[in-house]
């Protein structure tokens, strides 16, 4: 073991570190012990910026697409209008030609029948004029009906297309918001202990986490529960029952006195619990305390760690806390995965302090007084640690609630802006149709 005391520091930002304790010239800093800052707020801020950029881009694409489609429909309508005008102009010209022919016939009849009786000629003229008026009325009626039908059809098609585009965009926006919420939930869940987990089982993740820091735990053993129970069955009095062993806790952490490597100075029984969020048979942390105590007693462990992902979504979730054990000989602590190594280190330092006192005062030591004094120290240290951690977590929860409120306001603002833009487009289309109607009537007249 090394007696060098390293200064504790934490990272403030990419350019700054802060001392966590008073230091002197010549003291050293271990880079692998630097405490890293929880960057969940930064990740949430980046996620919010990405979401805002996505919504702006989606709205821009939609407006561009809508403008393009409206332009294409305007061009189509203008082409149809031109074709319709040309066809009707041709028909009108033909009717006017018929009128001209009839008028010529009337004039011819007048000239040819000047010598005939005026009454007979007048009757023919009246008859032809009646036919002429009938043809004019029929032409005007057909023209009005055709124009009204075309105009109504175009207006209805535009309104239907506008509503379809509106519904499509709203569905896309709603789906995007659902995707963002799902990603946010997954991001929050993984950021609470380590991004390095990457979907591995909790037991494997805890094992690899310990292996990464194993050199910090001198004279310690961290092994699967079944291995240590099998290997020490004679000394700890455990029956060699494979079926029972397979159902016991996951790991045991043992700390040995450098002067006695046969019996552990003290041990921690570790149980890892997790479940899928969509599971129909979900359990609570307190449901596993009794079994953990039994496993710890069987392995003669003084402490139990319930490393749990259960009840992560409960309000005011505490990351580390002592569980109620009904005056049990085993102290059980609920530990969230991100604090697993931190808690092992804390108990490791407590153990070093304990066997250092035992070695120094072995001849004159009042062990009961030492145990009572050390118990008070441990209780004071742990309770202060948990209290400080809970304050930090509560502050983070408050910040998350503020961010969620801001996200809700932004969603409402986006929806309001979207509705405003769509209403403006509808009004422009209505005005365009009204102006177009006037222009067509004027040209037809």
Swiss-Prot record:
Superkingdom of origin: Bacteria
Region (Disordered), start-end ranges: 139-160
Designated name of the protein: Uncharacterized protein MG148 homolog
